């Protein structure tokens, strides 16, 4: 389902299996106001030591660009916090070309305070778009990275004696 949304967003003429047709039609309707600027690009966030590929960079009707992540599971609310953190990392990253080890900034119009969760539950024939608070998401991601780093440290060794 995810690969079909990408093909649709890139303007490819594809044959969608009948099982996915209601989902793709719902996706097209829900995302009609969004203009896809980039899809499935690799990014790196050196500060958080994180990397990955975002689903979409989209332009809103007001001209702002925001990161969007597509989820096909049953319950979008179940993973809203983790998705906000994930999308916030992408929005605060640099485009990264692995072959040349080159980092490129996103366009200035990228809004790093808000993102979108595009919820397309597989087999339901419905699609809903939810706003994500990326300021909160980045705070969450930063805290998670700090915990990850703390877990890597070696604890101070304390001498202990049962008689002390």
Feature names for model-found ranges:
Residues 162-164:
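Replication-associated primase and helicase/ATPase modules
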Residues 38-160:
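Mg2+/Mn2+-dependent nuclease catalytic core
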Residues 1-51:
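Metal-dependent nuclease catalytic cores that hydrolyze phosphodiester bonds in DNA/RNA
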């Amino acid at each position: 389902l995810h690969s079909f949304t990408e093909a649709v967003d890139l303007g490819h003429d594809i044959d969608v299996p009948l099982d996915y047709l209601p989902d793709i039609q719902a996706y097209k309707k829900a995302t009609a106001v969004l203009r896809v600027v980039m899809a499935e690009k690799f990014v790196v966030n050196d500060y958080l030591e994180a990397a990955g590929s975002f689903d979409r960079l989209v332009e809103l009707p007001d001209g702002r660009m925001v990161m969007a992540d597509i989820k096909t599971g049953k319950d979008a609310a179940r993973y809203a916090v983790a998705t906000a953190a994930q999308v916030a990392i992408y929005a605060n990253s640099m485009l990264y070309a692995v072959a040349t080890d080159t980092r490129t900034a996103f366009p200035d119009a990228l809004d790093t305070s808000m993102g979108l969760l595009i919820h397309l539950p597989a087999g339901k024939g419905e699609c809903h778009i939810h706003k994500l608070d990326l300021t909160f998401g980045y705070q969450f991601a930063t805290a998670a990275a700090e915990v990850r780093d703390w877990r890597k440290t070696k604890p101070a060794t304390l001498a202990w004696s049962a008689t002390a």
